[in-house]
């Protein structure tokens, strides 16, 4: 397999990112609804305070996306949360791990982030396994956290504290 290259997401990446998030295997594990608009993705990739966007590329193609949101409130400025997705054709090939390593490196050494938070549906075992691999722990459960395919699903609150 070719090398996984992690870089900052550019506006030109929005179509590839939109296509990844439009995959049913991907959006069912996010809070996104089906059929996101081009405009929404263009806005999401615009520069915003506290937001860092990374993409994973293989042979120049975007195969993964991670957004870091560093809290802007002074008393929570040491905290970030993130969302991650991987093209379903590239699952189980190290893409999520490469994005996670780079995100943790940025948070630990460049962004003064001591706590990284996330939510994950309780039935998303592959994602939970990756998060635990990088030191995230389950801190609680949100009952009926979100609606997915017509049914409520619970989510874990997880965090990694430096």
From Swiss-Prot:
Q: Which residues form the N-acetyltransferase domain?
A: 4-162
**Which InterPro entries does the entry mention?**
Acyl_CoA_acyltransferase, GNAT_dom
From the Swiss-Prot or TrEMBL record, give the protein name.
L-amino acid N-acetyltransferase AaaT
Q: What is its EC number?
A: 2.3.1.-, 2.3.1.53
Q: Which organism is it from?
A: Escherichia coli (strain K12)
Q: Which reaction does it catalyse?
A: L-phenylalanine + acetyl-CoA = N-acetyl-L-phenylalanine + CoA + H(+); L-methionine + acetyl-CoA = N-acetyl-L-methionine + CoA + H(+)
**What does the similarity note say?**
Belongs to the acetyltransferase family.
Any one Gene Ontology molecular-function term assigned to this protein's record = acyltransferase activity, transferring groups other than amino-acyl groups
Q: What does this protein do?
A: Catalyzes the N-acetylation of L-phenylalanine and L-methionine using acetyl-CoA as acetyl donor in vitro. Cannot accept L-tyrosine as substrate and propionyl-CoA, succinyl-CoA or (S)-methylmalonyl-CoA as acyl donors. Is also able to acetylate and thus detoxify several nonhydrolyzable aminoacyl adenylates, but not the processed form of the peptide-nucleotide antibiotic microcin C (McC). When overproduced, provides complete resistance to leucyl sulfamoyl adenylate (LSA) and partial resistance to alanyl sulfamoyl adenylate (ASA) and phenylalanyl sulfamoyl adenylate (FSA).
This protein's superkingdom?
Answer: Bacteria
Give the EC class as a word. transferase
Q: What are the UniProt keywords, alphabetically?
A: Acyltransferase, Transferase
């Amino acid at each position: 397999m070719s090398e996984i290259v992690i870089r900052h997401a550019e506006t030109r990446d929005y179509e590839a990112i939109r296509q990844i998030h439009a995959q049913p295997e991907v959006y069912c594990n996010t809070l996104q609804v089906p059929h996101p608009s081009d405009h929404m993705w263009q806005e999401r990739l615009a520069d915003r305070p506290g937001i860092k966007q990374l993409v994973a590329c293989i042979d120049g193609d975007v195969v993964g996306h991670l957004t870091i949101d560093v809290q802007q409130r002074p008393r929570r400025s040491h905290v970030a949360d993130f969302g991650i997705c991987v093209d379903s054709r590239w699952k189980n090939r190290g893409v999520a791990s490469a994005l996670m390593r780079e995100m943790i490196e940025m948070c630990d050494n460049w962004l003064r982030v001591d706590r990284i938070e996330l939510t994950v549906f309780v039935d998303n075992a592959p994602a939970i396994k990756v998060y635990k691999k990088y030191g995230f722990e389950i801190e609680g459960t949100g009952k009926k956290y979100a609606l997915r395919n017509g049914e409520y699903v619970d989510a874990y609150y997880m965090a990694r504290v430096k």
